[in-house]
């Protein structure tokens, strides 16, 4: 089956924004203009197509990145048909993992900002993730029809807050109630959309007289940004020659692909204005799969790569798992190279297992179409893969490659869940395992002491939604305990020559293991490291991994309060063995004993997770908000005007003090302040806190 759309006309894009910037509405309009949706779904009716989980429609926030395929020929049908694979990503900080994993499989992104709120905290997180994966992006400033809308302020904030390099390619005509269209700076014409056709039709007109000088000023900046692409373009521009529209677009495109500039557009998705021009910009300025660097991976430990071509061996990345009530597990994957057909056997190179792809479906939000095959650049979902988890590679059986893995953060909050009835008990195990498979930032374990099931995640909302899904999708009723903080233990000083000896010799085959270690702090975030510094064979080679294993088995249970031990370096320096009685288990026990003793002597302490908290509040509540953060042991690190007459406060606060903060903040500011928080790092807990934590564990 030949390709319908050449790969050069593919655009794999993400639509990414802060909560309430109107991202889902923007995506809905895209689906409407590209002819997929006949009736526009409004978020505030709870009817948006991309938000298809029940909870999303109730809460009006997007939780899972739905992937949708659609086509666009341009506002004036001026392009050959292009194929857009759109991933709608959540804007809530508890779901940052979803943003991260969609950034990994995209080629370009549209950042949606609110013309009133501008660049908000979550926008910064998303921007950092886009930088990490070097994703070229354009920005769309939405809600131009709202009170207080200001396009140029948003442009300025992209520069100052995100350290981006924004280049507007349109400017708005009017704002708030008077917003009526945009001036296209490439054509130097006004674009006015027809309201009766919900913006399906438009006409070009002259630029309003009062906007001519503004439009000329911004056009000049845009042309200069395009000319900076090369010395010859710059010479032409400085020599006073006029650059053609094609040359300007080519210059802007090349610089956008290199992530040197971010073209900016504006509009009001709700009022059906501006989204159409933004779709044209996706074609003009964002890359096709062949214009981004070849995907890197490794084969047998050697670096390898795959180019976006149907002729290369098949390779794909599974970036999301979803459970579907009718067909079971859907595995969303992005094809980087080659072709795969339904019924083919592929290799999961991470696990070294072969699997058969049953059926392949392409999603339109929650609607699916079965297709025969997918090719390089496609995004689709497979039915029938059993073993695959998020972030793993699927590839041709005879051309093995492991694509770069995604990094998933460790959870910072735990709660205990208990099934309400015996019947719920078994179902809960199945449900939790399935949810954990879908979402790598969600973990499930059983507490050895209490026998309780503990679930961990990225925030209160994250866990709340998962418990909710357990009830809706799996029919499991559960009682949820109070949230617990994920404390850690570490050491503060170095100790040397600490020995652990495990000896049992009372006739017959005995046990003998003897290890001497140095224990030192390895620095924040460095994790556990083990170095073998044995000289002269005082411990035989085959027993050294056993010492390491014994220590690793002990790491999960610190000596102060049983929390996991992090950021320690162990050097195995000396020891002894017995020809007959030494065994692997004896050296595991020796390693464990040495480590426990060394921990006791090395100034053990408790670490607590610190959160980066950002509060936006009207000025009159600033004193109350700051006082409250101080009471929560927060350290205020800076204050800013938020550009709307309010203040933006940045602070670092221990997670333990942040439970229930949203309720307290709402009542202290009559619901007018908002906040976001994300995990920053672990830091040593003050003495009184550590003592309280240890007392609670006894």
Curated annotation (Swiss-Prot):
Main location, first listed in the record: cytoplasm
4Fe-4S in keyword set: no
Alphabetical GO biological process terms: ribosome disassembly
InterPro entries reported for this sequence: EFG_II, EFG_III, EFG_III/V, EFG_IV, EFG_V, EFG_V-like, EFTu-like_2, G_TR_CS
GO cellular component, one term: cytoplasm
Binding site for GTP: 17-24, 88-92, 142-145
SUPFAM superfamilies: EF-G C-terminal domain-like, P-loop containing nucleoside triphosphate hydrolases, Ribosomal protein S5 domain 2-like, Translation proteins
Keyword annotations from UniProtKB, A to Z: Cytoplasm, Elongation factor, GTP-binding, Nucleotide-binding, Protein biosynthesis
Cross-referenced HAMAP family: EF_G_EF_2_B
Biological function: Catalyzes the GTP-dependent ribosomal translocation step during translation elongation. During this step, the ribosome changes from the pre-translocational (PRE) to the post-translocational (POST) state as the newly formed A-site-bound peptidyl-tRNA and P-site-bound deacylated tRNA move to the P and E sites, respectively. Catalyzes the coordinated movement of the two tRNA molecules, the mRNA and conformational changes in the ribosome.
The protein, known as: Elongation factor G
Source species: Chromobacterium violaceum (strain ATCC 12472 / DSM 30191 / JCM 1249 / CCUG 213 / NBRC 12614 / NCIMB 9131 / NCTC 9757 / MK)
Organism taxonomic ancestry: Bacteria, Pseudomonadati, Pseudomonadota, Betaproteobacteria, Neisseriales
Gene name, Swiss-Prot/TrEMBL: fusA
């Amino acid at each position: 089956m030949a390709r319908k759309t050449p790969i050069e006309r593919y655009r794999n894009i993400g639509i990414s924004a802060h909560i309430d910037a109107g991202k889902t509405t923007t995506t809905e309009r895209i689906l409407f203009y590209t002819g997929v949706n006949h009736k526009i779904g409004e978020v505030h009716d709870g009817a948006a197509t991309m938000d298809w989980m029940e909870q999303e429609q109730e809460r009006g926030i997007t939780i899972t990145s739905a992937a949708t395929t659609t086509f666009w020929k341009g506002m004036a049908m001026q392009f050959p048909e292009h194929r857009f694979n759109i991933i709608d990503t959540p804007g809530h900080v508890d779901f940052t993992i979803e943003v991260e994993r969609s950034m990994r499989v995209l080629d370009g992104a549209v950042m949606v900002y609110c013309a009133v709120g501008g660049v908000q905290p979550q926008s910064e997180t998303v921007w950092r993730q886009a930088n990490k994966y070097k994703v070229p992006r354009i920005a769309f400033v939405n809600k131009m029809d709202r009170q207080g809308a200001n396009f140029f302020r948003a442009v300025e904030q992209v520069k100052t807050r995100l350290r981006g390099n924004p280049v507007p390619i349109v400017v708005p005509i009017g704002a708030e109630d008077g917003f009526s269209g945009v001036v296209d700076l490439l054509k130097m014409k006004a674009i006015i959309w027809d309201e009766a056709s919900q913006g399906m039709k438009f006409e070009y007109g002259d630029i309003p007289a009062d906007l001519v000088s503004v439009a000329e000023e911004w056009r000049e900046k845009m042309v200069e940004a395009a000319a900076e692409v090369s010395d010859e373009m710059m010479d032409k521009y400085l020599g006073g020659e006029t650059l053609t529209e094609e040359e300007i677009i080519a210059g802007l495109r090349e610089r956008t692909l290199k992530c040197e500039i971010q073209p900016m557009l504006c509009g009001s998705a709700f009022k059906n204005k501006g989204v159409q021009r933004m779709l044209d910009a996706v074609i003009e300025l964002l890359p096709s799969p062949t214009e981004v660097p070849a995907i890197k991976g490794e084969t047998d430990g050697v670096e390898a790569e795959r180019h976006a071509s149907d002729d290369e061996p098949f390779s794909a990345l599974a970036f999301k798992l979803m459970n579907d009530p009718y067909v079971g597990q859907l595995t969303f994957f992005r094809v980087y190279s080659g072709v795969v057909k339904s019924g083919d056997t592929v290799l999961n190179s991470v696990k070294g297992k072969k699997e058969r792809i049953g059926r392949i479906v392409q999603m339109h939000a929650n609607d699916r179409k079965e297709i025969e095959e997918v090719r390089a650049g496609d995004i689709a979902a497979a039915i029938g893969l059993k073993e695959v988890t998020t972030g793993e590679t699927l590839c041709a059986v005879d051309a093995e490659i492991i694509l770069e893995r995604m990094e998933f953060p460790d959870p910072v909050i735990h709660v205990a869940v208990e099934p309400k009835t015996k019947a719920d008990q078994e179902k809960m195990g199945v449900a939790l395992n399935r949810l954990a498979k879908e979402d790598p930032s969600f973990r499930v374990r059983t507490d050895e002491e209490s026998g309780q099931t503990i679930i961990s995640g990225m925030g209160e909302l994250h866990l709340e939604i998962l418990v909710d899904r357990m009830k809706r999708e799996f029919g499991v009723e559960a009682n949820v305990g109070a949230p617990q903080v994920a404390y850690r233990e570490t050491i503060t000083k170095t100790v040397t020559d600490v020995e652990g000896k495990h000896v049992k010799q009372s006739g017959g085959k005995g046990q003998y293991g003897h290890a001497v270690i140095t224990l030192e702090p390895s620095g924040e975030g460095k994790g556990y490291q083990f170095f073998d510094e044995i000289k002269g064979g005082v411990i035989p080679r085959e027993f050294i991994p056993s010492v390491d294993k014994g220590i690793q088995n002990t790491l999960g249970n610190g000596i102060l309060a049983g929390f996991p031990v992090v950021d320690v370096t162990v050097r195995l320096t000396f020891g002894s063995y017995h020809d007959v009685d030494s065994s692997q288990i004896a050296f595991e026990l020796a390693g464990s004993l040495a480590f426990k003793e060394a921990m006791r002597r090395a100034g053990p302490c408790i670490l607590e997770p610190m959160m980066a908290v950002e509060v936006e509040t009207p000025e009159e509540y600033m004193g109350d908000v700051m006082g409250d953060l101080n009471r929560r042991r927060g350290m205020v690190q800076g204050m800013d005007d938020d550009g709307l007459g309010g203040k933006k406060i940045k602070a670092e606060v221990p997670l333990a003090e942040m439970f229930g903060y949203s309720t307290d903040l709402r009542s202290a500011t009559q619901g007018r302040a908002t906040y976001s928080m994300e995990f920053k790092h672990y830091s040593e807990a003050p003495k009184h806190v550590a003592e309280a934590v240890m007392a609670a564990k006894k």
